[in-house]
C-alpha cells in the first residue's frame, strides 16, 4: 500500500526541506563485497546468482525503515512493502523493466524472478508494481566495473543498486556494488548501514 504522508510528521522532515528542491539530490556509495558464499549458495540451491543477489538486497532493505519512505515530485509517500526492479534484455534486443515483490522465502522469490523476467523478455512489455517501494537494480555483467554512477533526475527517485561482473581469486570472489539513493529518503549513514547489512545477509547464506 502507498499513502502520502506529511514530511513534518516523519523523521525525514529536515532532509525534505533541505534536499527536495536540490538539483542533484542523489548520493552514491560504493562498497566491494565478498560474494564467495553467495556464489556457493547460488550453485547449491540452483538459483541464478543475480536472482539470489536481488533477494539479498530485498532482505537487507526490508529491515531499514528509511526504505519504506520515498519522495515523489514535491510529496512524500510511505509504503508497507518492497519490490526489486530488474532490467530485462528482451527478445527484440531492447530492454524492459520487471518488478518482483520481495518475500522472505528466497526460493519463492527466485521462482517469481524466473517466471516474470521470462514473461517480460518474451512479451517485450514492462511489468510494474505501483503499490510497492521499488529498489532498482542493474547488472552489467559484460565486464568488471569498479563504480557505477546513475543518472540525476527528478523522474526516478528510487534507490538503485548496480554491479558488473564478479571477480575470482584463489581465496574468494568479490564484487564492487554501487548504491544510489535520494537524500530525502535517507542519509549517508543509513546507506552505509544498508551496505553493511547486505554483506551480513550474504555471509549468512
Name each region found by the language model.
Residues 2-8, 20-52, 66-82, 135, ...:
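Gly/Ser/Thr-rich phosphate-binding loops and adjoining beta-strand/alpha-helix segments
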Residues 130-144, 159-196:
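Histidine-centered acyl-transfer/condensation active-site motif
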Residues 9-12, 59, 64-69, 73-78, ...:
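Catalytic/RNA-binding core of pseudouridine synthases
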Residues 38-63, 175-194:
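Acyl activation and transfer enzymes in specialized metabolism, enriched
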Amino acid at each position: 500500500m502507498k499513502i502520502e504522508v506529511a514530511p513534518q510528521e516523519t523523521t525525514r522532515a529536515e532532509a525534505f526541506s533541505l534536499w527536495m528542491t536540490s538539483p542533484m539530490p542523489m548520493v552514491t556509495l560504493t562498497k566491494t563485497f565478498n560474494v564467495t558464499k553467495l556464489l556457493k549458495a547460488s550453485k547449491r540451491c540452483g538459483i541464478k546468482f543475480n536472482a539470489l543477489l536481488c533477494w539479498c538486497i530485498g532482505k537487507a532493505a526490508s529491515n531499514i525503515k528509511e526504505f519504506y519512505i520515498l519522495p515523489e515530485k514535491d510529496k512524500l509517500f510511505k509504503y508497507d512493502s518492497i519490490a526489486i526492479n530488474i532490467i530485462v534484455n528482451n527478445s527484440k534486443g531492447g530492454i524492459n523493466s520487471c518488478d518482483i515483490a520481495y518475500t522472505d522465502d528466497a526460493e519463492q522469490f527466485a521462482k517469481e524472478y524466473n517466471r516474470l523476467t521470462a514473461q517480460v523478455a518474451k512479451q517485450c512489455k514492462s511489468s510494474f508494481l505501483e503499490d510497492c517501494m521499488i529498489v532498482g537494480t542493474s547488472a552489467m555483467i559484460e565486464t568488471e566495473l569498479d563504480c557505477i554512477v546513475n543518472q540525476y533526475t527528478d523522474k526516478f527517485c528510487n534507490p538503485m543498486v548496480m554491479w558488473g561482473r564478479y571477480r575470482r581469486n584463489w581465496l574468494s570472489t568479490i564484487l564492487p556494488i554501487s548504491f544510489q539513493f535520494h537524500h530525502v529518503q535517507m542519509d549517508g549513514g543509513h546507506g552505509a548501514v544498508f551496505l553493511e547489512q547486505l554483506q551480513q545477509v550474504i555471509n549468512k547464506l
